[in-house]
């Protein structure tokens, strides 16, 4: 049931979500906490949650559907981070760190998708 917990992709996505949640809750302006802040939190949550849901599915097609949704949500996170930097809600150093975190999730997630595709 909890097959996702051993996956590096999920572990890193879970860590990324916590960072994004704290950043959006603590650093974004009050007016943005319910706009961009909410969006980045939801997208970050979706990355990890879709891995969980995908790994709970029985068919490879369903697993791939949710893993692909996770990958798309990760792209959304990357764009939200870009917007946060453009609006000066985060520093350049924070931006670079978050982009690196996104890449740390992307690499094992794409490997997981490729491996799942090969089993089907």
Please place each PLM-identified region on the residue numbering.
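Amphipathic alpha-helical assembly/interaction segments
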Residues: 1-120
């Amino acid at each position: 049931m909890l097959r996702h917990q051993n996956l590096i992709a999920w572990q890193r996505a879970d860590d990324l979500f916590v960072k994004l949640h704290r950043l959006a809750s603590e650093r974004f302006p009050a007016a943005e906490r319910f706009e961009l802040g909410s969006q980045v939190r939801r997208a970050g949550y979706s990355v990890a949650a879709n891995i969980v849901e995908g790994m709970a599915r029985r068919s490879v097609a369903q697993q791939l559907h949710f893993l692909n949704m996770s990958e798309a949500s990760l792209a959304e996170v990357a764009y939200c981070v870009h917007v946060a930097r453009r609006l000066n809600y985060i520093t350049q150093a924070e931006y670079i760190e978050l982009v690196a975190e996104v890449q740390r999730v992307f690499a094992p997630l794409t490997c997981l998708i490729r491996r799942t595709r090969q089993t089907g």
